Amino acid sequence: QLNAPALLAELTGIDVVADFRSRDVAAGGQGAPLVPPFHAAMFGGDAPRAVLNLGGIANLTLLAPDQAPRGFDTGPANVLLDAWCQRHTGQPFDADGRWAASGRVDGALLQALIAGEPWLQSPPPKSTGRDLFNMTWLDARLAGWKDKTPADVQATLQRFTAQTVADALDAALPQAVEVLVCGGGARNAGLMRDLADALRRPVRATDEAGVAAQWMEALAFAWLAQMHVDGLKAGVPEVTGARGPRVLGALYPA
């Protein structure tokens, strides 16, 4: 995404594989998410489960026996939590959800946030980003809730992340027996508690399944790069909406 693979190859003297999204987009897909086939390779098995990545945006990979993996974004993960925390505390993130824990979830505000965003109601495959879920979006939706304390809003935003994930999983793979969590949000103890409460099934970090949560994305793209080098198709049309699987990425030799 930095779009400097030729420069990287020149400076490092190492073959570089990059630009994984373009071929999927050319085939009619959304170009994201791209990690579900790696999740399937690592965590697929004889029981239905989900893998939840909590970066700025939350995305789910659905793994069911004898089925192609499916995946899609569910809404904001850390993007709103971090921005609201930065504005009101000066800290870049809410460590372990401690600030959120000092507030109270407002049920009416939570429902207003969910019901007021059409994207949340749209069916998969779908993806989103900071172009939609940002402080402009949040400020517009808080305009009628000026009486809420910043800590109460933080608590409600944390539950908003958990509830939108739970709603998406219940609609797409209700038989999932567990949820494995990766990304920065897996280190937020408060968010993990909210997820366990909303999902009503075991929730654990991918560390417990053998893959460090903070390295998941890096490992996934290393895997995608190797798939390209081997000439293997890694795109999953059930995930991105493309017309078919494609070999993803472009090689920039050293």
Where are these regions (language model features)?
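Short beta-strand-loop/turn "lid" adjacent to the catalytic site in phosphate-handling enzymes
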Residues: Q1-L2
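Catalytic phosphate/nucleotide-handling subdomain of diverse soluble enzymes
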Residues: A83, Q163-R246
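Generic structural signal for well-ordered alpha-helical scaffold segments
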Residues: H39-G44, A143, R159-D170, Q226
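Phosphate-binding/catalytic loop of phosphoryl-transfer enzymes
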Residues: A6-E10, I14-P92
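Acidic-glycine-rich active-site phosphate/pyrophosphate-binding loop
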Residues: E10-I14, G56, L132-A140, G190-R201
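A short glycine/serine-rich beta->alpha loop
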Residues: S22-G29, P69-G71, K148-D152, A205-A213
